[in-house]
């Protein structure tokens, strides 16, 4: 059971499937990997892979409770139901802490600044390095 259908959650579910597990994805948004800046080839591949391999994906569904033998979730119509699971992996978003205000020698880069990809992280690090 993977709670969170962002890039990390989808990559975890993909890896679990390749290991012979039976992952289930629960995502609050109306699509998997619903964030800008992610490589279209990667996100399209993962969506197509889950569809072709019949990996259960519950979109617009919220986690209500984690239990010993599964989770309770609520869909967009307000229906609450149980999904059996041996393990639950939380791959959910978070609100970043504003470090910039806490020190003058702090440079926020990468996903801490804005979700992107390896190229945007490297460019951001290069920009900061050139200013030092």
In which residue ranges do the predicted regions lie?
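Rossmann-fold NAD(P) dinucleotide-binding segment
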Residues: 101-103
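Hydrophobic anchor at the start of a short beta-strand
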Residues: 23, 106-107
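A Rossmann-like FAD-binding core segment of flavoenzymes
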Residues: 18-99
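Glycine-rich Rossmann-fold phosphate-binding loop(s) that bind the pyrophosphate
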Residues: 3-7
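A conserved FAD-binding loop/helix module that cradles the flavin
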Residues: 9-16, 35-42, 107-132
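A residue-level detector for conformationally permissive "hinge/kink" positions
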Residues: 1, 83-85, 108
